Amino acid sequence: MQEDSKVYDITVIGGGPVGLFTAFYGGMRQASVKIIESLPQLGGQLSALYPEKYIYDVAGFPKIRAQELVDNLKEQMDKFDQTICLEQAVETVEKQADGIFKLVTNQEIHYSKTIIITAGNGAFQPRKLELDAAESFEGSNLHYFINDLNQFAGRRVAVLGGGDSAVDWALMLEPIAKEVSIIHRRDKFRAHEHSVENLHNSKVNVVTPFVPTELIGEDRIEQIVLEEVKGDKKQVLDVDDVIVNFGFVSSLGPIKQWGLEIEKNSIVVKSTMETNIEGFYAAGDICTYEGKVKLIASGFGEAPTAVNNAKAYMDPKARVQPLHSTSLFENK
């Protein structure tokens, strides 16, 4: 296993929106920062699950696309030379006798003076389509994540699922794809009423109550066999792409073994955002305290609190209260 012997000031576990802002703010406090992210890209759930959806509750933006928000956060962070480690899941964390944290991932060993975990609801994985050969099509035209809607331009797309994500993707694909079908095992969808109304008023082919029973194709899925849930009807759908929206399963996983105080699947923090382990902080949806509200906006406020207190932990002479950003950047 590789080892990065450099000891960073702050290691951020989780590269979602709160993690990105944490890394930026660490740079503002002149700390060396490393981000460790388990996914292949930064942005967390915003990039992985709904990059094309709009967010309406971020201060200063009447609305902003999820991926655009991530891109802005990355641009903001890029003012500083932060180290990014992708596709690495932290498995163990140990505070050594010298006070330095040793973090072991599935690929590498890292060292840090402090840790700020911003891992959202923990690691998340999509619920898979459980059909023979489904896994073999994941690298071609069976999708659990969508990064660019335009890749489906002029194509026949089948969306599997009945929740908000499935309905939203079907509606967003309608003006782009050649043909969109949504397949759900029940007659009624579990999505927002307004979205369901829009779906039924759209040109999307609604197929209910049917389930996929077979995927036909060699290198790519060419057809899906659909069978009625309570009945004998069967139909075959020609497709170019299949998008699966059966939801996601999130778990704290190994985080529970790190000696942190956990309450209802969240890490308990003080008003400084410090956990029960000195030098180990948490921000965003993964942490909890009295009156906690799980919003991106809340996480953006918790990140500077964690960074400023981490700075004071590393250097007791440092001010917890920082200078205003205008002063910092004008002096550069």
Swiss-Prot record:
The keyword Transmembrane helix does not apply. Gene3D superfamilies: FAD/NAD(P)-binding domain. GO terms for molecular function: ferredoxin-NADP+ reductase activity; flavin adenine dinucleotide binding; NADP binding. InterPro entries: FAD/NAD-bd_sf, FAD/NAD-binding_dom, Fd--NADP_Rdtase_type_2, Ferredoxin-NADP_redctase_2. Keywords: FAD, Flavoprotein, NADP, Oxidoreductase. Its cofactor is FAD. It catalyses: 2 reduced [2Fe-2S]-[ferredoxin] + NADP(+) + H(+) = 2 oxidized [2Fe-2S]-[ferredoxin] + NADPH. Binds 1 FAD per subunit. SUPFAM superfamilies: FAD/NAD(P)-binding domain. It is an enzyme of class 1 (oxidoreductase). Its EC number is 1.18.1.2. FAD binds at residues 37, 45, 50, 90, 124, 285, 326. It holds the Pfam family Pyr_redox_2. Homodimer. Belongs to the ferredoxin--NADP reductase type 2 family. This is Ferredoxin--NADP reductase 2.
